[in-house]
Each structure stands twice: as structure tokens, then as C-alpha cells.
């Protein structure tokens, strides 16, 4: 009796994936996730909002600040870690 239940679960999973794909641009399921990550990549959390540690994120070509030294709130230029 496990086989019919497994088939039903697989079919329901396929339907939900197809349903979600239809709602995104170009059928890319990761599109909303990429936007969410990009938002936090471009606007990093300020030092007061995090614990005291060294934090880096991806540097953009047009940005001078590539990371925060959380303890002092200093902006670290690209290439210096």
C-alpha cells in the first residue's frame, strides 16, 4: 500500500512545482530568491545590528566598501581583508 501513496505524493509535488514555475518570470524558480539575496548583498546590515566580528560580502565594481569591521564600524576597501 506504500506505492500508491508515494505516487500520489510525487504527482502532487510535480503539480506544485509546475504551479510555482508558472508564476515566475521565464519559468525560473530561483528568480525571487536571487532578488532576495541581491537585496541583502547590496544593503549590508549595519555594525550595530550584528555581533562584534569581521563581516564581508561580495564587492561590486562601483562600490568602495566591501566589508564591515563590526567592532569598530570601519568600512574595509576591496582587496583588504
Swiss-Prot record:
Task: Tell me the function of this protein.
Answer: Blocks voltage-gated sodium channels (Nav). Intracranial injection into mice causes lacrimation, slow breathing and death. Intrathorax injection into crickets causes death.
- Where does it reside? Secreted
Which protein family is it in?
A: Belongs to the neurotoxin 15 family. 01 (magi-5) subfamily.
Q: Which cysteines link up through disulfide bonds?
A: 52-66, 59-71, 65-75
Q: Pro-sequence positions in this chain?
A: 25-50
> What domain notes does the record hold?
The presence of a 'disulfide through disulfide knot' structurally defines this protein as a knottin.
Organism field: Macrothele gigas (Japanese funnel web spider)
Expression sites (tissue/organ): Expressed by the venom gland.
Matching InterPro entries = Toxin_23
User: Which Gene Ontology terms cover its molecular function?
Assistant: sodium channel inhibitor activity; toxin activity
State if Ubl conjugation is listed as a keyword. Answer: no
Q: Where is the signal peptide?
A: 1-24
Name of the protein in its database record: U12-hexatoxin-Mg1a
> Taxonomically, which superkingdom?
Eukaryota
Query: Does this entry carry the keyword Signal?
Result: yes
Give me the Gene Ontology terms describing cellular component.
Answer: extracellular region
| Keyword annotations | Amidation, Disulfide bond, Ion channel impairing toxin, Knottin, Neurotoxin, Secreted, Signal, Toxin, Voltage-gated sodium channel impairing toxin
Residues bearing Proline amide are 78
Amino acid at each position: 500500500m506504500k506505492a500508491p501513496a508515494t505516487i500520489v505524493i510525487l504527482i502532487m509535488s510535480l503539480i506544485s512545482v509546475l504551479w510555482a514555475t508558472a508564476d515566475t518570470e521565464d519559468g525560473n524558480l530561483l528568480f525571487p530568491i536571487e532578488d532576495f539575496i541581491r537585496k541583502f548583498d547590496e544593503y549590508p546590515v549595519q555594525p550595530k545590528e550584528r555581533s562584534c566580528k569581521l563581516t564581508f560580502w561580495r564587492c561590486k565594481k562601483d562600490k568602495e566598501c566591501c566589508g564591515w569591521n563590526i567592532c569598530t564600524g570601519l568600512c574595509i576597501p576591496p582587496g583588504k581583508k
